[in-house]
Amino acid sequence: MVTRVASSERPRPLVPESIVDAPTQRLYAIGVFVALQAYKIYDLLKLETSSISDVPKSGFLVKWIIIDAIYLRLLPKFRIPWLSFQPAATLLQIAIFAAINLLLSSLSSLKWISIGSILLPYFKKKELSISEHKINPNNVIHNSSRILGQYTLQVLPEGTAKINPLHENYCLNSLRKDQYVDLAIQFNSTIPKYIQYSHVDLETKEETLVEVSGRSLRKLLSSSSKNPKEPRLQTIYLKTNKRGLYTLKHVVDKSKLDVRIFRSEAVVVSCPTATFASRQSGGRLRERCVGDTDNAELKVTGVAPLQVTYRNWDGKHFNTHIIDSTIPDDFHPPAVVLSSNPKDIVFYKGIDIQWARSSEIFVPINTLLKAPGQWIYAVTQVTDALGNSQQFPSNDQFLLRFAHGYTEADGESHSLPENVYSVFVHQRPDIQFRGCSIESPANLFPNKETSLSLYSSFSEYNSLEVGVDRYELGLDPQNITVPPLSHKTYQISPRSSANINVKKPGIYVLSSVSSQYCSGEVLEPNTCLVVTPPEAKVSVSFEEISDQCAGSIGARADLELEGTPPFTIAYRMTKDNEASRIQYVTTDRTRYQLNFTPKKAGKYRYIILGIQDANYGYRELSGSSFYKDQTVFPLADASFEERRNGDLSTVVKTSCIGDTMSLPVLLTGSAPWTLEYEIFRNNKREESHVVESKDPRYILEVPMLVHGSQYTITLVSVKDSNGCKRSLNTADTVIKVRRQRPTATFYSSDNTYTLKSVEGALMKIPLRLAGEKPWYVEYSHTSGLNKVSHHKEVLNDPNSYLTVRKSGTYTLLSVSDSSCPGTIQNVEQKYQVEWLPRPFLSIPSLESSVKGKTRYYEQNAVCAGDSSAFEVQLSGSGPFLLKHDKILVDEKSKTYPKQKSELSTVQNTVLVKADTAVPGVYHYEFTKLSDSLYSDSDAVTIVNNQSYQAVVLQRVNSLPKASFMNVEKLYTFCINTDVTQSNAQLIAIQLQGASPFSLVIGIKNELTGSVSKYTLNDIHESVYKFAFPQEQLTLGKHVVRLLQVRDANGCAASITKTQPAAKVSVVEMASLAPLGSRQYYCVGDRLSFALQGLPPFDVEYEFNGVTQHATSDSHILTRLIELPGVVAMKSISDHGSHCKSYINPPIEQIVHDIPTVRISNGKDVIENIHEGDQAEISFHFTGTPPFSFSYARRALGKKRPGKVLETHTVTGINEYEYKVLSSVEGVYTVLSVQDKYCRYPQDSTSSSNI
């Protein structure tokens, strides 16, 4: 009785229901039980069908009683609901299943005997005898020892090895001796045991073989990397620090098989570098001046051609420059090097390995330094021809520091990297006098010194060195031809007041100025006049003032003054020797009258006490001439017209040296008048005049003013008709005579008087002007066509410029300033303005023709995919930027969209890489050419002073094509077919391209694996009929592939293995051969014949004179011989060839003995090979030669060989060993063997397997 535990008392399952619920656990338990019972039945059937009769049934019984008991005992331990039985129930279940097992083992024998008795009649089989009637084969004796051994050939996936699978390029830094690179070697479907690679030195081409095996290789494999997505691939890395070409030579895997090596290579070169060769030692910066040209030199090292990118900071902006196609002189790289993809460069295609050596190239970088400050050049990237690139990000950060105000003057100039170049551009100094000129001289007092003020806009901290020349007074400052009296050099600081002290009068001229680094420019005014002013003096003459009626009414003191106005005179008037206050009067005239008109009568003394002027202090006067005593007891008058109102202030006029001047004087009184006046120059009396006039308005003519100084015209006295002469006390007229007339001249710091600039630029011709602003300058311009034009300019700066926009010759014609006409110092002086030439290009290596304004250059035609380039020579001021358009017109006359490209270089030659990807005609139209002077100038070529647009034409021919027309067709030939007959099959090949063609064809024998190549030349047809070669008519299947086709253009195309191939099958004509060469047979044995061809076969033979017809669906015709006799085989035909083969003479044969054969000495051998390799299968015979045998290749199975894939029969073996080479996977077994007399097997079962 089966009992279950109540649900309320049932314990929880061993596996919690939260993980697997109870129904699912029951399902799993029942499933295991069913599986055990099913396997029990299978085990029973296997036991009963075993050929080993003495296997005991007790073993089966004990085994399954134990298995069932274990299962039933363990089941309650899981406490599965509804399957959790009590121990008593479990014991009962074990007993029941033990009884069932006993019943099965005891009843099985009877059951199989009864089944066998029913099925036996159906398995009995009869065979045909030689007389074509069926007989019982029980008389056939089985002897398995006659054929021993089995050869299993497994073709493993083809193991491959490839160095540098990603086609990377490697480089080593020449400065780092401890640097290594990791060369990748990738293995596919294999594990290496031995590696041999070669290293070719780039300099000497010396090849060194290196072997890696044992512990070294195991260490590399342990650190190898695998791709999770491609587990068959494994990559190891070889460390090396030697430059050169690396290739794999030999690889052996763990099966001791050679591994196929892909054609690949790894190149290790020196990393490209770029340093500035013109750096000063210690990395110190160079010193330059504004306007200088800095000639830096960049040393580039690496595999040419190289590309260099550098940036520079000019104090305000960053500029990026790219230098393309940097190559050494006389450098002619292989065409493939010009490919845009460095991975196209492979040295096994015939490129000289020494081309990969490093070249050292010096590239000039010429820069016009336009602004002061620190200029920085930094290399940011260098790339060589192989794609190796060195970047310098730290240099970008270095440049950014300068953008934020850092300079090397801050103390880190010694830390400049080698690929950073620095030049400090200093401001050029200038110098001029301030507050002193020819017109405004400086005063030098006796026994003293005076300070001359200098001005400079120079803003640097460095001191200036100023050269000053002194000339004697009296020379013309504008035309000094004598040597200076002295030359002195002064050190001044431009950031503070700059003064020089002089102790001698003269003409001081600034001759030069320079700073610590730069020469400078002397600006106007550059001349300072230093004079010693005269001491203040006065002469006094007293005259009584009398009236005709009243007599003396006072006195007049006439003061004649010498010195520098204004004058201050101290005087006093005393009466009767009584003291009185001192009075002062100030005047800027050289003559002055003091009128003493006492109001009261008395005895008076008029005293002139002292004098002072603008330069000298107060000086007391003494002597009788400076006072007058008088006892005091209208008049004729004259004044300058400007002071008719009685104003006593001085009249100031300006005149030019060498001019005259008229001064109107108004006379009062009774005509006629006698007027006396005096002329003073530089406060010294020069001449005195007395004139008569009847007109109250008299014009006083001043003589020619031949000296550049100050003239004072003083009215001394006037007398009218009454005879009363009166001394005058009226205002003077001062005439300031300019010491020089304005002058103009061109200025050139280098005395070339030539300006060169880009066409259309605004240029400034420097002038030097003397005089007072503004200046009115007239000049002429003569063009290149001798056309003359006149122009006028108004200028306000003595260091002005003429702003011009046209080239030609400029000549100064006249100059005048605010008051005087002037002169041109050198009327023959001319200034030349020239345009710098525009850049242009030339292509001397190509033939050209002209059509209109375009010159067409013809580049040699190439084939699609080939490398091509042409050289363009550039003329101008580098660096250059060349722009061109590429237009393709393909073979169908379709015009592709225009593609624009740019090439930059600092050299005068640039290589333009041609595009050959798509067949057609390429037009390379050069549109713009820029250099350092001109931007986007038209790119032209100049021939015989004519400009043309340059267009390069190149035809790219398409690659020829070849393909089989009937790829699905199987071409079948009999082994003895004459392929030269007109009815022989031909293989049609379609050809495309320019005829005649050359074709390379490969024919592979699939049985032997051998490949034969045939080259067919001078093919003119577009459809070529290929005759299969007679020598290739060997048994088996053949694959005909197209390997390469070449057309009349010289273009060759390799045809990939993915393109369909033609399949050819060569079969034998139906043939018959006895399995053995005996004339006697063994009684009871079968008489068997090997049939060659495609079954079914029809065989005609005679037996004891009776003609028989036999058919066979296999390659073996077997008949049991029940009677002695002679068998004569007459003819045979098969299904494949449909031709009947007559056997002449007929084959007569008798079976006599049974031979034996052993494969690989009778052992079961398993050998592994790679795809493409061959294995050797050996067969050893016993018996009487000659031997013949048949063997089969079966498919590989998991436990036993699979179906038969092919069979072969070999006859005429006179040796006891026979070897077969095969590259086809399968299990090779012998089916039959025959010697001179007998064959084996003899029974029909064996025959059916042959």
Curated annotation (Swiss-Prot):
The keyword tRNA-binding does not apply. PANTHER family: NUCLEOPORIN POM152 (PTHR28206:SF1). Component of the nuclear pore complex (NPC). NPC constitutes the exclusive means of nucleocytoplasmic transport. NPCs allow the passive diffusion of ions and small molecules and the active, nuclear transport receptor-mediated bidirectional transport of macromolecules such as proteins, RNAs, ribonucleoparticles (RNPs), and ribosomal subunits across the nuclear envelope. This is Nucleoporin pom152. It is a single-pass type II membrane protein. Functions as a component of the nuclear pore complex (NPC). NPC components, collectively referred to as nucleoporins (NUPs), can play the role of both NPC structural components and of docking or interaction partners for transiently associated nuclear transport factors. Its main location: nucleus. Disulfide bonds: none annotated. Keywords: Membrane, mRNA transport, Nuclear pore complex, Nucleus, Protein transport, Translocation, Transmembrane, Transmembrane helix, Transport. It is found in: Nucleus, Nuclear pore complex; Nucleus membrane. Residues 101-1250 are annotated as: Cisternal side. One of its GO terms (molecular function) is structural constituent of nuclear pore. GO terms for cellular component: nuclear envelope; nuclear membrane; nuclear pore; nuclear pore transmembrane ring. One of its GO terms (biological process) is protein import into nucleus. The chain crosses the membrane at residues 80-100. Residues 1-79 are annotated as: Pore side.
